[in-house]
From Swiss-Prot:
This is Phospho-N-acetylmuramoyl-pentapeptide-transferase. Its main location: membrane. It comes from Bartonella tribocorum (strain CIP 105476 / IBS 506). The chain crosses the membrane at residues 25-45, 70-90, 93-113, 138-158, 164-184, 195-215, 235-255, 258-278, 284-304, 333-353. The gene is mraY. It is a multi-pass membrane protein. Disulfide bonds: none annotated. One of its GO terms (cellular component) is plasma membrane. Keywords: Cell cycle, Cell division, Cell inner membrane, Cell membrane, Cell shape, Cell wall biogenesis/degradation, Magnesium, Membrane, Metal-binding, Peptidoglycan synthesis, Transferase, Transmembrane, Transmembrane helix. InterPro entries: Glycosyl_transferase_4, PNAcMuramoyl-5peptid_Trfase, PNAcMuramoyl-5peptid_Trfase_CS. GO terms for biological process: cell division; cell wall organization; peptidoglycan biosynthetic process; regulation of cell shape.
């Protein structure tokens, strides 16, 4: 919306700054953070009143988690509100990548909201059918992948190679849908401790904001010899809003958390990250930058698969952050150490932009 005012720069030279993606990214970050920070307390109070007992605590979880009983969930509503309002103010609303990313984020958020609603109302840690949830997620992700295919290429880039795409043809749709759904659920599995998921999400969002900006700028893309994707630069503004909203949410989610993100937030943010990775052709780099999410997801896959085969467990508890809690790490130790890992992995992922 604010981009519109840049057309009056002949009369008001100062508004020309709205043309710049870098300025609007910072502005979106500050706007979304302020919205979440200001309206957070009232949203938390409303959710606490409506939810009563709050999010159910896993009976087989660490004993220290039972003191969290009564903490409201669906905190993703705060995050999504900040992102959407800020995005509509600062993003280029004619950009198709913006709308595709918003479609996935809000659709995944709605799926997560319904899952949270069932958990709270039924007071169980099980939401609605996993198959039904995955089916809905794949449906939304496939639509997004189809749209991206229509406006771009069917390829994905390999790290360390100069502007080289592996073209998938129509297989691009199921491949991209898998990336989006897998990322959404990986972030969802990571969201198990106070502040654990939101900081790695912000780290990944900031990293992909840079990637989106570079991929969408012909000069930078040519200099770095990465694939140029016209229009993706605008995703940096949207991801800036994610970072700002995440900072605002962390104020309330820091231990001891006043609110949990819930599936409402984790699915939405993960789905958004996956969509941006697909749009910028950096799906493989997402595995590096979002490596913490990958490890969390694979720990569950390994645990479930091994248990079905042997009736034994590889980890004391999955996802893997609970394993370290069972090993004697405090919650703060797990969270901060996982934050450090996510930052290191992001730096490794970003280094691939230059190492070609």
């Amino acid at each position: 919306m604010m981009l519109f005012f840049s057309s009056f720069s002949d009369w008001f030279p100062g508004v020309n700054v709205f043309r710049y993606i870098t300025f609007r990214t910072i502005a979106a970050m500050l706007t979304s953070g302020l919205i979440v920070f200001l309206f957070g307390p009232s949203i938390i109070a409303s959710l606490k009143l409506r939810q009563g007992k709050g999010q159910p605590i896993r009976a087989d979880g660490p004993q220290t988690h039972f003191k969290k009983a009564g903490t409201p969930t669906m905190g993703g509503l705060m995050i999504l509100t900040g992102i959407v309002v800020s995005a509509f103010l600062w993003c280029n609303l004619s950009n198709i990548y913006f709308w595709v990313s918003l479609l996935v984020m809000l659709s995944f958020g709605a799926i997560g909201f319904y899952d949270d609603y069932l958990k709270v109302t039924k007071q169980t840690d099980k939401g609605f059918s996993g198959k039904a949830r995955l089916s809905l997620e794949f449906f939304v992700a496939a639509i997004a992948a189809f749209i991206i295919l229509q406006i771009g290429s069917s390829g994905f880039a390999l790290p360390f190679l100069k502007d080289y795409l592996i073209h998938l043809g129509w297989f691009f749709i199921p491949f991209s849908a898998f990336v989006i759904v897998a990322t959404g659920n990986a972030v969802n599995l990571t969201d198990g401790l106070d502040g654990l998921a939101i900081v790695p999400v912000m780290v990944a969002a900031l990293s992909f904001a840079l990637i989106a900006y570079l991929c969408g700028n012909m000069n930078f893309a040519d200099y770095l010899q990465i694939h140029y994707v016209s229009g993706t630069g605008e995703l940096a503004v949207l991801l800036g809003a994610v970072v700002g909203a995440g900072l605002g949410f962390l104020w309330f989610n820091a231990p001891p958390a006043a609110i949990f993100m819930g599936d409402t937030g984790s699915l939405a943010l993960g789905g958004l990250l996956g969509t941006v990775a697909v749009a910028t052709k950096h799906e493989i780099v997402l595995v590096l930058i979002g490596g913490l999410f990958v490890v969390e997801a694979f720990s569950v896959v390994i645990q479930v698969g091994y248990f079905k085969l042997t009736r034994k467990r590889v980890f004391l508890m999955a996802p893997i952050h609970h394993h370290f809690e069972k090993k004697g790490w405090t919650e703060s130790q797990v969270v901060i150490r996982f934050w450090i890992i996510s930052i290191v992995l992001a730096l490794i992922g970003l280094s691939t932009l230059k190492l070609r």
